């Protein structure tokens, strides 16, 4: 395992440029955020291996002359231009609701893997690729039971300061609402984890699934030694969010009202 001075996980990757294929167009040189490529005798050449391995040089090369070692898969060629319909994307956000009522229907494994793929492909700061995804399936009820036990102990305190807490009973399904799957998202960087979670939700929505972000379970997991031990996260990582996921039992008829944004142009 190789880590540079900025702590970027590099895992023995190396950039290679095929001089036979390179046409010296300099597209990789202009696009490299690390300024790690130069032109030598009309061919692109790597200065050293200390970069974030973002792969922009691989993606932009018109002749497929650049590669990065150490990956299990080959880059996918973009066959044609595609564009999302802006109004469709906005409506997906507009009509998206947090789901707390789920059908008793499991999620197909192929669908689940595509959702997880969205998390894997999500961009991360400095290309850290430091997001851990945990799918709760067989252990879901066990972990929820641990979290319920913890919350039942602290509920009397919450009741003293919140009328809403008084109205909410801590049931056996208080956290996951009997949803078939839960995806836990952990990282050292909260933004990296949040971006992965959001992308996974978009793919889940495309498959007709509904999602709840369980802040309560996240809170319980980060305060429970038992749950931490069960999750066995990589050193330094923390659970950032939990995507409770399944097919909605209810259909919403319209958008919900929202306050105006606090937007400033400068």
Give short role names for the model-derived ranges.
Residues 2-266:
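Acidic, surface-exposed loops and disordered segments
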């Amino acid at each position: 395992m190789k880590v540079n001075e900025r702590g970027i996980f590099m895992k023995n990757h190396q950039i290679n440029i095929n001089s036979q294929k390179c046409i010296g167009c300099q597209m990789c040189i202009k696009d490299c955020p690390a300024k790690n490529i130069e032109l030598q005798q009309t061919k692109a050449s790597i200065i050293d291996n200390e970069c974030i391995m973002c792969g922009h040089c691989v993606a932009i090369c018109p002749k497929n002359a650049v590669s990065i070692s150490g990956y299990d898969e080959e880059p996918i060629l973009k066959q044609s231009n595609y564009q999302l319909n802006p109004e469709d994307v906005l409506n997906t956000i507009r009509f998206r609701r947090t789901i707390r009522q789920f059908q008793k229907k499991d999620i197909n494994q192929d669908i689940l893997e595509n959702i997880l793929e969205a998390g894997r492909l999500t961009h991360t700061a400095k290309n850290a690729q430091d997001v851990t995804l945990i799918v709760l399936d067989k252990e879901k009820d066990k972990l929820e039971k641990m979290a319920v036990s913890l919350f039942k102990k602290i509920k009397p305190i919450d009741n003293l300061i919140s009328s809403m807490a008084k109205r909410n009973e801590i049931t056996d399904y208080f956290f996951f609402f009997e949803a078939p799957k839960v995806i836990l998202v952990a990282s050292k960087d909260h933004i990296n984890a949040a971006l992965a979670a959001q992308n996974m939700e978009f793919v889940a929505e495309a498959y007709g699934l509904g999602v709840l972000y369980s802040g309560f379970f996240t809170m319980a997991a980060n305060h429970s030694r038992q749950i931490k031990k069960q999750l066995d996260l990589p050193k330094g990582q923390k659970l950032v969010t939990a995507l409770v996921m399944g097919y909605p039992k209810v259909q919403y008829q319209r958008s919900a009202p929202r306050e105006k944004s606090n937007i400033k142009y400068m």
